Amino acid sequence: AMLYALSPRTLSTLTAISSETWPVMLAPWVILPFLNAKLTWRDAAAATIPVALMGAVNATATIAACTPAAVILLYRRAFRPGAAWLLGCLAVSAWWIGPLVVLGRYAPPFTEFIESARVTTRWLNLPEILRGTTSWTPFVDTERVAGYELATESFFVLVTMGIAAVGIYGLSKLPRVWSVMLVVGIAVLGCQVAWYLNALDGPLAALRNLHKFDPLVRIPLLLGVARACAHLPLPRSLRPTKKQTLGALTLLLCIAVVSPAWSQRLLPLGAYKEVPSYWHEATDFINTHAADTRTLIYPEASFARQTWGWTRDEPAQPLLDVPWAVRDAIPLVPPEAIRGLDGVMAALKEAPATGVRSLQRLGIGAVMVRHDLFTGEDEALASKFGGEVHRFGEVDVILLNHAGMSLGPTDPVRVAGGGEALALLDAHFGPTTRQLVDRDADIVTDTPTLSDRNYGTLDGPISAPLAANDPSHVNNRLRDYPSAGPLSQVETHGGSVAVSSSAADATAFGGAQPEKSATAAVDGENSTAWWPAPGDDAGWIELRGHFTQPRLKLMATSATTVTVRSGSAAVDVDLKPFRSQEIRVPGGDTEAIRVDLSHRTGIAELGVEDQPVERVVTVPDTSPDVHKFFFQRMLQDTGVLIRDF
């Protein structure tokens, strides 16, 4: 019981996201009535009580906690008690299932924009499943101290594998139903076939956090440990027997595997005692003086990680009585509205004084500027907004106007673009009524672009604009937030460009740098350059097309030696910083010219004389009577602004 209550997955979630632990702790109590020799409706009723106690805290975790009981019922072919139990579960859960179904019809499709099945299942191999380190979060972040140590430290790898080995041994002495449950659990957690993963990103998206099904593995394994320990006595003298020695070793394993709990490592990073008083003062002021408008919490942050503690959710959330908005990792609003928030963030970052004009569309008349984020912020930021500034410690409150519902006296201006375009147009030309359309627009913008988005970060989340056949580097089903606007994308001419990687990739370490994409190598501007992604020290870039006796023009951003390849022929070339060099490509006519780097550097110029290869962001022609074009690089700073339209 102790090993189950303090299993690795529990230690990984407790105190950080305890809602995922609560239903799991009740799973054994659901099973218990179904272990009687003869099952009746009373057993089904008894098994329903712990399901009722799981509450509505996490629907998927509730289903997962009931799955071990379902396995036992199916194994025993106890269909009548099983049906009675299912009806009981539905009855005690109807109070939250009903609203969940109704709200699900109106909720934005946020599961498309969070962790994908490729992320949640990446570390679910057999050893990790048996050890119990099934939660994916500790593998990508050190925030959950206990979970991170259990997942990565060799000591815990050994002791958790030791417990798993004891459990497998003991399991061989138990009834077969427990072995069946273990096999089912391994199959559910460890299946890596494509159709299964695709289903977890599609109709089964609610179940993609498979670690919630850990009880299918943990219950039978720990029953096996209990069975093994029952026949392993502890030493009673200084000369223990073999069994007593094994018993002592097993006890030590049990103590060691739960050591994160008794060594005070349960709390995650950023634990805090209370929210500072200045947050209470600031929110009280807003509740009094900005009650008839919406408040923007600025700047954006994936999660609320302050210098005084990591609340994860916004510290103002339980304190504000007024409408408020923030750009965080998972805004629970429609995708177009998220794009609109991104446009507001870009406008405020570019020029706060004019960017505030984009707030009126969202009904925002007050801004909370926080200076206590872990990343650090400009203390003078609030003064750049204009408006009436009130200071409360590390939080500034700016009262702009009491913006509410906006009414336009004329028909809206039709805009071909994404939600972000509305905010940018407001910032530059002033707010007015505008409508997003996909054709016959009065204003044509270069948004949205075909891009990859790393939904897991707000620090350089968007790649450079891409061509239709460029590979995606993100695992989500949707490359970016969908939009009503026509898609601007890179069109290639004279051939194509392929690269080993790019610092402009959405998944590049440290965030995407759109000015370092493959397009930058062939844009005719020496101020921009393609760079391989950080960590790609042997990168390459390749021109593909039909080249006759090609002469290559090449320029690097630093002194380096590159290898120019064409088929089986190759030549090494020494380059000086920002000095163009012409090279006769070995091998004659070719369909591919590759430049291999000897170390990570930028390629500012790459082209074949008289046979240019181009990549240009092209705005689709959907509006023959357009009155105005609006192009920008605030959302994706590509270094230069080149558009074909």
Residue spans for each PLM region:
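Membrane-interface junctions at the ends of membrane-embedded or membrane-associated helices
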Residues: 35-45, 74-81, 172-173, 218-248
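Periplasmic/ER-lumenal interhelical loops and adjacent helix-loop junctions
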Residues: 88-170, 210, 432-486, 493, ...
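Extracytoplasmic/lumenal acceptor-recognition loop(s) of multi-pass membrane glycoenzymes
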Residues: 290-358, 447-526, 629-644
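Membrane-helix boundary/interfacial segments in multi-pass membrane proteins
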Residues: 10-21, 113-121, 144-155, 183-224, ...
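A short beta-strand element within beta-rich, extracytoplasmic domains
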Residues: 525, 541, 546-559, 595
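Membrane-embedded helix bundles of polyisoprenyl
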Residues: 1-75, 82-100, 250-261, 295
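Extracytoplasmic
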Residues: 245-327, 421, 428-436
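Membrane-interface helix-loop junctions at the exits of transmembrane helices
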Residues: 1-17, 92-108, 121-140, 168-211, ...
